[in-house]
Amino acid sequence: MWRAAPSEKKQIIIMKICFKLFGVNAELLIDHAWGYEPCTIAQIKAYRPQANSSGSGQVLQCPYPADKARIVVQEMTDQLVLDLVEHGFVTDQIVLTVGYDIENLTDPVRAKRYHGEVTTDRYGRKIPKHAHGTANLQNHTSSAITVVEKTLELYDRIINPDLLIRRIYVTACHVRTEQEAQKEQTYEQMSLFDFAEETEEQKAQKQALQKEKQMQKAMLSIKQRYGKNAILKGTNFKEGATMRQRNGQIGGHRA
């Protein structure tokens, strides 16, 4: 049955009620009710987020001790950096989250040793509170040597080595293109004994970074042509490593 639109006075009353109930979100509901879309396609295409991030997470097939989980963190960070290189991105911040297994509290021996904070997972089971930390890099980079080193330092600093680990999440924050990072001006405090010119050490560092970038691109080229397991590192063959197995999966399932 057709109904006439409410009067202007009634519309105002309804709008006031909506804003009282839903706050600023009421504006979206009102626009939707009238079939009005304030955002144009041009605005959607022109949108650029203030911050970007790239990351990966892994739920381990069984509880891992801290030393084995460290190998997985190294593998994940290595792969994350390769993904950045592939898309021409760099980062200056790494965030690491490590989730512990319920066995830390269900096993009487382990539970007796643990005196830290306890929380619950999404299934309502008690687990030790996860470890979480951030590592800031000196500048934007996609150097695996730099990023992996900082991530492992962060891992060693935040985890409890006595607990079993089940989940690992590694995220690269403040991600931007290499061109955007180069445009940004950086400043460094200098003393009277510093020289403005590039030192031999700085030149050597630049050359080392360039060589590493060339090696990373060569690795990507080989992987894209012959498969992800065509070129691996010694770390990937250590006990507890998961990269070789994960490379054969699609969406986390065996291909």
How would you name each of these model-derived features?
Residues 124-255:
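Acidic, metal-coordinating catalytic segment for phosphate/diphosphate chemistry
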